[in-house]
Amino acid sequence: MLETPAAIRIDVDSARDVALLPELLDLLLLLDVKATFFVTTGPDRLALNLFKYITNPRSSIRFIKSKPLRYGSHSLNGLLRKTQVETACPEVLLRILKEGHEIGLHGYDHYAWIRNLRSMDETRIKELISNGLEALKAVTGADIRGFASPGFTVTNAFLRAIDALGFDYSSDFKSNKPMSPFYPQTETKGDSVLQVPVSMDSIGELFIAGYSDSQIKAKMCKNMDVWHAKRVPFVIYAHPAHEVGCYMELFSSVLRDLREDSRFIPLTLAQIAQKWKVRV
């Protein structure tokens, strides 16, 4: 039986995410699974991100369901104290590499990126990405070849920027239906950076949407069946502050099910991109 590629994408958006990485790495070591970690660089403005929900009555229910207390004292980052995400704990980022996982870049200044990307031109976006690459390399020494836009925020200017900077692949799209890796089209030409989409909402997002544990497990199983039938790479993603900090038991169960399913072969996103380029 032909195996379907499967990947675990971990988004590190804040210092709180960094603080929970050791627990996540222990789990991955136990399961013998390699993951791709997309690390945000620049200032941690978590307090501003939470504040926008408090000041918007329409978002209050979503805010409560998101379990804001999961961030603990890190909720003050960006308001009462300054913290750089990539320097919050350099040792744990080095451990990611030491244990054979992949590190990619998740933008620079996560809060400002999501808030302002749509108004940025290509030059400004390239400047921010270059700042991020420099910051992450200074801590890890890694040659960063993969990218993931915070909030799955995409513009034509952004696509041109990652193309110009020569990334091997990027993961900037999410679809609840099978979507093969693809090369997007800008208004002027086809992009040369392969996109590897995420396959479904995270566990945390599904909880906020009202799903129960059993419904999330059922949705995961159904999606695995559909993606395998289509032979499309199955990519799940998580945030340590959510899946590790709040839903560790369910998250562990989901990863174990995926690891033990003989229909799937665990790969990093870089490995999926490499294999797909050979295929096409």
Model-based region annotation:
Residues 1-146, 151-194, 214-236, 243-280:
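Catalytic alpha-helical scaffold of carbohydrate-active enzymes acting on polysaccharides/glycoconjugates
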